[in-house]
Every structure is written in C-alpha cells, then in structure tokens.
C-alpha cells in the first residue's frame, strides 16, 4: 500500500494569508507550479489558490491582483488528504472534487502536496489512463 507521504512533494511552499494575488502569481512562476497552499502565521492550511483562480476570478473580472488578497479567492475548507492515506484515496478525492493537486496533512500540519503526476508515477502503466480520465471529467 503506497501512502500519500511516500509520493508527495515534501515541504510545500505556502503563500501567506496576508499576501496578494500578485505575490502568489510570482511565487507560482518562481516555483513552476500552478497552485499554492495558503497558510496562516501558524503555518496551518487556510485555503488554496490556483493560477486559474487568479486569471478567471480576479483579472477577468477587472480585479487588481496587486491589491487583492489571496484569501479573497479561498473558498470554504480546502480539500485535503492525510499523509498516511493510500494513494487510491488521493485519487478518489481528486476525482470527486475535480482537482489535480491536494495538500497533504499530518494532524493539523501541512506536510506536502500530492499531484496527479505524483500518483501517475506510482501506478502501473495500464492505470494511468484511468487516472487522467477520472480527474478530467
């Protein structure tokens, strides 16, 4: 049984809850990622922000990413997975919520991120197509 902690990207970089969408966009560019966890001063997960959120929900609506806080786009409780959950649980969670990445939580602490690609690298070749299809619906 492969666990989320075995395939996740450790030490996920957070954008802080007081930062702007422009700060988040620069951090995404620098890290070459499409999503970032939003963390509070206690380094606990407060939400998620994606490059698509910034474009569609801020810029396309006439918003100013240099003055709009990241928490403006955080919606509800973020979907997460436990560090000791099996990757099949991660896959099912991604499929149910139509997301490609999940924050990995151990207790209340953010310990990493797991992506569709992380899971695909650890699946038999014949299962990869099923993964992509399930998440892309």
Give the residues covered by each predicted segment:
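Short hydrophobic/aromatic-rich motifs at helix boundaries and adjacent loops
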Residues: 7, 25-27, 41-43, 61-63
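Tandem CBS (Bateman) regulatory domains
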Residues: 1-11, 50-95, 110-137
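A glycine-centered beta-loop-beta connector
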Residues: 28-31, 36-52, 94, 102-117
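The conserved cystathionine-beta-synthase
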Residues: 14-32, 39, 81-98, 105, ...
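Residues in soluble alpha-helical coiled-coils and helical-bundle/repeat scaffolds
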Residues: 64, 99-102
């Amino acid at each position: 049984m492969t666990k989320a902690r075995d395939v996740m990207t450790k030490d996920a970089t957070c954008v802080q809850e007081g930062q702007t969408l422009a700060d988040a966009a620069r951090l995404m560019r620098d890290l070459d990622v499409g999503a970032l966890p939003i963390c509070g001063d206690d380094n606990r997960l407060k939400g998620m922000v994606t490059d698509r959120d910034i474009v569609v929900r801020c810029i396309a609506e006439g918003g100013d990413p240099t003055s709009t806080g990241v928490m403006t786009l955080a919606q509800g409780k973020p979907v997460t997975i436990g560090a000791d959950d099996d990757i099949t649980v991660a896959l099912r969670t991604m499929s149910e919520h139509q997301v490609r990445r999940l924050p990995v939580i151990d207790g209340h602490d953010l310990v990493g991120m797991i992506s569709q690609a992380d899971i695909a690298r650890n699946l038999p070749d014949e299962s990869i197509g099923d993964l992509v299809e399930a998440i892309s619906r």
